[in-house]
Amino acid sequence: MRVLGIETSCDDCCAAIVEDGVKILSNIKLSQKEHKKYYGVVPEIASRLHTEFIMSVCQQAITNAQIHASEIDLIAVTSKPGLIGSLIVGVNFAKGLSIALKKPLICIDHILGHLYAPLMIKKIEYPFLSLILSGGHTILAKQNNFDDIEILGRTLDDACGEAFDKVAKYYKMGFPGGPNIEKLAKNGNQYAFNFPITIFDKKENRYDFSYSGLKTACIHQLEKFKDKNENITKNNIAASFQRVAFENLIIPIKRAIKDTNIKKLIISGGVASNLYLREKIKNLEIETYYPPIDLCTDNGAMIAGIGYLMYLKYGASPIEIDANSRIENYKHTKGKTV
């Protein structure tokens, strides 16, 4: 079965053709450079550019896959969560294409796409732990199947990638913040600033994360946390921030490993491409899996891949289905999440 996957939840306009859930025939992504001068994504600009480019991006995906549009068997599209204007563009385009081609439509949760991305490259036996790190989400989950997910912890404020973007914006390090901070950090002292690590000890929050305190310390309280022998430089700020941002993740992950006795972890989302993070995770001495870089960030292939499985199990979505900006509450739930 050939699936066209469409992803427009934020500022990347993506489309891909995937066969039987794992064979990627094409994977096209158009990143919107217009946001760089604002040091962040402007929702109105994002939705307007999606409207402008979505048809050509989908056509390129079909062309690169060396198929005709009539050979598409299913259309999968991200319908939640994300920027509502961007989501509406993708969902409405997918609906129109579904009607025009007389092909079934399945609406997919963006989070499920990220969780599935590593499995497109390597077969991993369930259950395993999953960590999603992106500009919009920081989620630690236990996965028993592709549609059986228990959220163990999530950020209580800023997402990990969001904190990177905000710190980078304040110090004019460039957008997106993640890759630019990682680059600057290579020439900095990661112990120049002793920023606070936020860990929750209450049972109901023991797997949760928080980045607002770190962000505030890094932006407004540099002198308070500076080593007296170090200078305030962008490189030192970046290196120290990056170290603590990822140390914030380690203790909840260790707790989840101990409590579930699961020794397998998959990590996805844009922040998962950070090489410093990957070195930190190595110290956990467990089986760790990452998707390739082009599947870490938002992409249409992961939507097509999980769309194939969801369609086989649950069938098509009703054509009346709408986009939804809110994140699904998966905690202790199982079943249809479209």
Swiss-Prot record:
Top-rank EC class of the record's enzyme: transferase
Primary location recorded for the protein, binned into one broad class: cytoplasm
GO function term, MF aspect, one: N(6)-L-threonylcarbamoyladenine synthase activity
EC number of the protein: 2.3.1.234
UniProt keyword Transmembrane present: no
Binding site for Fe cation: 110, 114, 298
Any Pfam family hit: TsaD
Keywords for the protein's UniProt record, in alphabetical order: Acyltransferase, Cytoplasm, Iron, Metal-binding, Transferase, tRNA processing
Protein origin, superkingdom: Bacteria
Locations listed in the record: Cytoplasm
Cofactor comment: Binds 1 Fe(2+) ion per subunit.
One Gene Ontology cellular component annotation held by this UniProt entry: cytoplasm
Annotated substrate binding sites: 132-136, 165, 178, 274
Cofactor(s) it depends on: Fe(2+)
Keyword tRNA processing appears in the UniProt entry: yes
Catalytic activity: L-threonylcarbamoyladenylate + adenosine(37) in tRNA = N(6)-L-threonylcarbamoyladenosine(37) in tRNA + AMP + H(+)
GO BP annotation list: tRNA threonylcarbamoyladenosine modification
Annotated InterPro entries: ATPase_NBD, Gcp-like_dom, KAE1/TsaD, Peptidase_M22_CS, TsaD
Function: Required for the formation of a threonylcarbamoyl group on adenosine at position 37 (t(6)A37) in tRNAs that read codons beginning with adenine. Is involved in the transfer of the threonylcarbamoyl moiety of threonylcarbamoyl-AMP (TC-AMP) to the N6 group of A37, together with TsaE and TsaB. TsaD likely plays a direct catalytic role in this reaction.
Family to which the UniProt record says this protein belongs: Belongs to the KAE1 / TsaD family.
Protein name, entry field: tRNA N6-adenosine threonylcarbamoyltransferase
UniProt source species: Borrelia turicatae (strain 91E135)
